[in-house]
Amino acid sequence: MKKFLALSVFAALSHSAWADVNYSLAVTQPEHHLGEVSVEFPQTAQAHLDVKLPAWRTGRYEILNLANGVRFFEAKDDSGKALRWEKIDASTWRIHLDKATQVKVDYQIYANELGKRARHIDDSHAFIDASGFFMFSESFRQEPVTVNLDVPKAWRSVSGMANAGSKHSFKAADYDVLVDSPIETGISEQHKFAVDGRDYELVIWGEGNYDVDQMLEDLKKLVTTGSVIWDDYPYQRYVFMVHATSGAGGATEHLNSTIIQRPRDRFGSREDYLAFISTATHEFIHTWNVKAYRPEGLVPYDYTHMNFDKLLWIAEGSTSYFEDHLMVRAGISTTDEFLKTLTKTVNRHLLTPGRKVQSATETSFDKWIGQGGDHARNYSTNIYLEGSLISMALDIDLLSKSQGKQSYRDVHRALYNQYKMPHGFSANDVKTVLNDLTGRDYSQWWADNVDAPAAIDFDALFAKVGLELKRPKDAKAVASVDAMAKNTGELLTLTHVRRDGAAWQAGLTTDDKIVAINKKHVGKDLTASLETFKAGDKVTVDFIRRDTLQSTTLVLSNDFDKDKKLVANEDATAEQMALFKAWMGVDHPNLAKK
């Protein structure tokens, strides 16, 4: 009886050890970007167990085919016996079972994709996004998980996940939490601080020209701004991970952390620093918008296929819109810096021919297959730019019709309160929120500005908040070919030809190399080569295409040497200035000068 009881206890303990899904990663050959992964799955009585590595990672709407880094795959049962397996698609391994058993899989992972923010191993650190390292089974996706790392002694490990008994182990409620909680392990600089009862960490891998004290000061300001939009915070602890490196840039949001990558020498100037802190703000806002509530097409995540949705302009564009507002409200950036940034956004929109072709709905759905480049600029928009401006137009519309009492912030507060994960929201849900908030039907507005290419009247829009979009008085009219070019040795190569512009009408296209205008060699500056001409002039352009010298006639168009700028209207009324303050949370520039 005692022997049977002892065996029963042992069996129970063994089963409990494998009741969770257990992940292990050993950094074995860091100089070659290699690690060894083990995954232990609980007992299953299925005829086969399918295990998968995601094809993409959260926060990046692009198929990355992460399974291409897997080699030496093996599967064993709970007695150590090898199990037969086969690969049935690009990212799925099918393990055949002839009895009920726990399953262990082992494989080598190659991690040298730092810029994709999915996986990287070298002799100084490992960046671990579970999407790029850890396989999962749909059968056990909802089970608790643990992660254990075997890394060099000098390394420190940090994640948004809670520790699981040692400094290199972590635990999560399930695979979805794991995959949205990256781990930074290695030689890093770490700083901790607390604000309003919540804990924060700043972890920096790499050396650069950053000012840690300034970063900490502004991050402390930033994290207080969540209450400007939402009623509460969806976390108790948050981690800012920063890679100061070379050859990588960008950022990704996660549940209660973010990873931000910048060139190591791009922190020092005011412009570079604002780019960094605005990125941190963008990812911080995502803690609510995308992580706490998101469009229904992303709920739940399908890790092996494209997750299409028509509201990515809200997920990303509205986040971009709010980032500039929160930076001003936090006192991180000035009103003048905000107006400068918004000016660039508006001018970029106006110079994008695709804004007249593709709607926010379409660009959201097509994000997964967006190709970028010249064709995209001429025939497409993007979810960040277009979504930001549509959000602004809606915000000012709400404010102006309610005398500053209702705003787009109220819309996102309602989305957070009513559609928290695991629920998603639809376009109809957003329109319902708008209708409930205002008592007005926004269906036609949505049809005109979201489902159709948005035709924003910037002059009328900015007038409501006491601003003007105007060209500087010293701007001069200049001749233009409506194209952009870069210097490639002795010749200028066209990089963008604006649809229906002068160069387009003349038959020029991207990658044409400009040799001469009216038989005179074009130097390194296309604009300088046009200084002696005026709009309407016909010129002969000699160019090389496919190694063949060709010629065309081009009629120069009219342009200006300076773009329009968004400035304060010196004659703004008290009502307009009050609406500006309701919009931005700070005084109108006219009042700020007094």
Listing of model-derived features with the role each one plays in the protein:
Residues 155, 230-234, 283-292, 296, ...:
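A generic secondary-structure signal for well-formed alpha-helical elements
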Residues 323, 332-594:
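C-terminal recognition in membrane/secretory proteostasis and scaffolding
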Residues 56, 108-110, 152, 245, ...:
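Solvent-exposed coil/turn segments that connect beta secondary-structure elements
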Residues 189-312, 318, 322:
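Juxtacatalytic substrate-recognition/specificity segment
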Residues 22, 34-38, 48-50, 92, ...:
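Intrinsic-disorder/low-complexity, polar/charged segments enriched in Ser/Thr/Lys/Arg/Asp/Glu/Gln
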Residues 1-18:
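Gram-negative bacterial Sec-dependent N-terminal signal peptides
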